[in-house]
From Swiss-Prot:
Gene coding for it: pyrG
Protein function: Catalyzes the ATP-dependent amination of UTP to CTP with either L-glutamine or ammonia as the source of nitrogen. Regulates intracellular CTP levels through interactions with the four ribonucleotide triphosphates.
Entry protein name: CTP synthase
Organism listed in the record: Bartonella quintana (strain Toulouse) (Rochalimaea quintana)
Organism placement in taxonomy: Bacteria, Pseudomonadati, Pseudomonadota, Alphaproteobacteria, Hyphomicrobiales
Catalytic residues of the enzyme: C380, H514, E516
One Gene Ontology MF term: metal ion binding
Binding site for UTP: S13, K186, T187, K188, P189, T190, Q191, K222
EC number: 6.3.4.2
Length: 542
C-alpha cells in the first residue's frame, strides 16, 4: 500500500520545495523504498509549454513528450527515475478534463462545482497508478494562502480522512528570516503560515525550516509549541553550497527518520548513503576550473536554463573541474565584437530558444567558435543557427535564414509539418495552435559510424528528448556537407537532421535534441562530459 507525503510551502515562494521533495525521495530511496514524485501546479495554463521562460523558467520535457515543471528535472536527477506525463498536472488541465466530461454528460446533469468535482479530479490524479510504489511525494505549487492553491489543499485535506490511518503526512517548508538589526531569527512568519494551513484543516506533521544560519534550540521549541508539532519534527534546512549537498544535510538533521516515525514505521531500514557521500566529496575536491560562455536569450533568469546548468556541472564533475559560466545576452553581439568577450573562454555553448531576437548575435558567437577552434556545443536552436552560419559564411548561400524569422528564398531551417512518432505520422498546420504541437519527447537518432559524436556515445543508435517546431532543411544537406559540415546524426527515416560536426575542428558539435534533460549527477551525459573535457584541453592553450 502506498503512503502519501504532501509538501507545501509558506511565507514566500521559491523556497525550494522541489529540491526538498527530491531530497526526501532520494533519502527514502536510499533506505530501499520505491518512490514516485508528482507536482501539482495551481496555474490555469494546461501546461507550461507556451509560457514565457521569464514567467515560468525551464520547460522540462519527459520521455513521453509532456511539457512539465522544471521541478521534475530535480526529481529525475536526484532519484534517477524518469518522470512521465502523469507526474505533473495543472489547474488548467484539471478544468479541461472536467469541462470535457461535463460536455459528454458524464455528470448526469449535476451542477459542476469546485467541491466535489474539482477536488475529486485532483484526488484521482494523486492516487492513480501508484500500485508499484511505497511512497508518493506530491509537491503543491505556490504558497499557502494563494487563492489558486485552495482546491489542491482541500483535496489533500480530504485524502487524510479517506485513506487508511497513517497513510498521509504533511511536510511544510517555511522560512525563518534573520533580522540583522536585532540579530535574531524570527519565528512569527512560520507561525502565521502554519496557522493559515491549520485554518483549512491541515496540520503539518513536519516543519522544514529554511534559514541562513543554525536555528537555536529555544527557537525550535518555540516553533514546536506554537505550530503543534513535535520538537524533533522541526527540521532546520540551512543554505548549502550546492543542491547536491542537501541530501546529506537533511539526512544528518533526521528528516527521513522523522518521516518514517510519522508513518509509524519501526524498525526502519538502514540507509545506504554511499553515493551521496561520494558526490558531495567530489564536488568539494575538484582539481581545476574552466570557463565557458553560454550565449543565450533568457540569461536574465537562470531558471530558464536549469537543466543545462546542472548538466554542465555534471560534466565538470566527470572531469574533476569546476565550470564557471559566463552568461552573455546574445543581442550584445549584434552591436559589439564577440572577440573581446569570447577570446578568454574555454568553450562556447548556444542553447535552445525560439524566435528571431538574439539569433544574429548567436550566429556571431558560432562563427567565432568555428574560426578560432574553440570547443562549441549547439543545442536545438544552437544547431540550427550553426547550419545557417556555414550556409552564409562558407557556402555563400544568399539570404540563408530560418522561416521562423522571415520569408526567405533559402530557408536553411524550416517548419516541420510532419514527423514520425512510434511509427505514427504526426502532422501540424502552419496556422495551428502552439500548445503541445511540437516534436516532443524521446525520439531515436542514427549516428554516423566513425563520427566524433558516435565515439562520444560509444554507439550509433541513441534515444534523446526533443522539443522543437523547426528543423534543419534536409534539402541543403549536400551543399553544406561540401563545405565541411558533417551531418553525423539523422532520424531513422533519414529525413530529420539530428547532429552535426566538423572533422577539422577539435570539438564542434550541434544536436537538435536536448541532452541536458537526461544528465544525472551520478551519470553525466556523455556529450557534456566530452565537451567539458575539450574545454579542459582548451584551457591549456589559452
Amino acid at each position: 500500500m502506498a503512503r502519501y507525503i504532501f509538501i507545501t510551502g509558506g511565507v514566500v515562494s521559491s523556497l525550494g520545495k522541489g529540491i526538498a521533495a527530491a531530497t526526501l525521495a532520494a533519502l527514502l530511496q536510499a533506505r530501499g523504498y520505491r518512490v514516485r514524485l508528482r507536482k501539482l501546479d495551481p496555474y490555469l495554463n494546461v501546461d507550461p509549454g507556451t509560457m514565457s521562460p521569464y514567467q515560468h523558467g525551464e520547460v522540462f520535457v519527459t520521455d513521453d513528450g509532456a511539457e512539465t515543471d522544471l521541478d521534475l528535472g530535480h526529481y529525475e536527477r536526484f532519484t534517477g527515475h524518469s518522470a512521465n506525463s502523469q507526474d505533473n498536472i495543472t489547474t488548467g488541465r484539471i478544468y479541461r478534463n472536467i469541462i470535457e466530461r461535463e460536455r459528454r454528460g458524464d455528470y448526469l446533469g449535476a451542477t459542476v462545482q469546485v467541491i466535489p468535482h474539482v477536488t475529486d479530479e485532483i484526488k484521482r490524479f494523486i492516487t492513480t497508478g501508484n500500485e508499484e510504489f511505497d511512497f508518493i511525494l506530491c509537491e503543491i505549487g505556490g504558497t499557502v494562502g494563494d487563492i489558486e492553491a485552495m482546491p489542491f489543499l482541500e483535496a489533500i485535506r480530504q485524502l487524510h480522512n479517506e485513506l487508511p490511518r497513517q497513510s498521509v503526512i504533511y511536510v511544510h517548508l517555511t522560512l525563518m528570516p534573520y533580522i540583522s538589526s536585532v540579530g535574531e531569527l524570527k519565528t512569527k512568519p512560520t507561525q502565521h503560515s502554519v496557522k493559515e494551513l491549520q485554518s483549512i484543516g491541515i496540520s503539518p506533521d513536519i516543519l522544514l525550516v529554511r534559514a541562513d544560519r543554525p536555528i537555536p534550540e529555544t527557537e525550535r521549541c518555540k516553533l514546536s509549541l506554537f505550530c503543534n508539532v513535535r520538537p524533533s519534527a522541526v527540521i532546520q534546512a540551512l543554505n548549502m553550497p550546492t543542491i547536491y549537498d542537501v541530501p546529506m544535510a537533511y539526512h544528518k538533521e533526521g528528516l527521513d527518520s522523522e518521516v518514517l516515525c510519522a508513518f509509524g514505521i519501526d524498525p526502519t531500514p538502514k540507509p545506504k548513503m554511499d553515493r551521496w557521500e561520494d558526490i558531495t566529496y567530489r564536488i568539494h575536491h575538484l582539481e581545476g576550473e574552466v570557463t565557458i560562455a553560454v550565449v543565450g536569450k533568457y540569461t536574465g533568469l537562470k531558471d530558464a536554463y536549469k537543466s543545462l546548468i546542472e548538466a554542465i556541472a555534471h560534466g565538470g564533475l566527470a572531469n574533476k573541474v569546476k565550470v564557471n559560466i559566463e552568461w552573455i545576452e546574445a543581442e550584445l553581439f549584434e552591436k559589439e565584437d564577440p572577440a573581446s568577450y569570447l577570446q578568454k573562454v574555454h568553450g562556447i555553448l548556444v542553447p535552445g530558444a525560439f524566435g528571431a531576437r538574439g539569433a544574429e548575435g548567436k550566429i556571431q558567437a558560432i562563427q567565432f567558435a568555428r574560426e578560432r577552434k574553440v570547443p562549441f556545443l549547439g543545442i536545438c536552436f544552437g544547431m540550427q543557427l550553426a547550419c545557417i552560419e556555414v550556409a552564409r559564411n562558407i557556402a555563400k548561400i544568399e539570404n540563408a535564414s530560418s522561416s521562423e524569422f522571415c520569408e526567405t528564398k533559402n530557408p536553411i531551417v524550416g517548419l516541420m509539418t510532419e514527423w514520425l512518432k512510434e511509427d505514427v505520422l504526426e502532422k501540424r498546420a502552419k496556422c495551428g495552435n502552439l500548445g503541445g504541437t511540437m516534436r516532443l519527447g524521446a525520439f531515436a537518432a542514427e549516428l554516423k559510424e566513425g563520427s566524433h559524436i558516435a565515439k562520444i556515445y560509444g554507439m550509433t543508435r541513441i534515444l534523446e528528448r526533443h522539443r522543437h517546431r523547426y528543423e534543419v532543411n534536409v534539402d541543403y544537406k549536400d551543399k553544406l556537407e561540401q563545405c565541411g559540415l558533417i551531418f553525423s546524426g539523422m532520424s531513422p527515416d533519414g529525413v530529420l537532421p539530428e547532429a552535426i560536426e566538423y572533422a577539422d575542428h577539435p570539438w564542434f558539435i550541434g544536436v537538435q535534441y536536448h541532452p541536458e534533460l537526461k544528465s544525472r549527477p551520478f551519470d553525466p551525459h556523455p556529450l557534456f562530459s566530452s565537451f567539458i573535457e575539450a574545454t579542459v584541453e582548451q584551457s591549456r592553450l589559452v
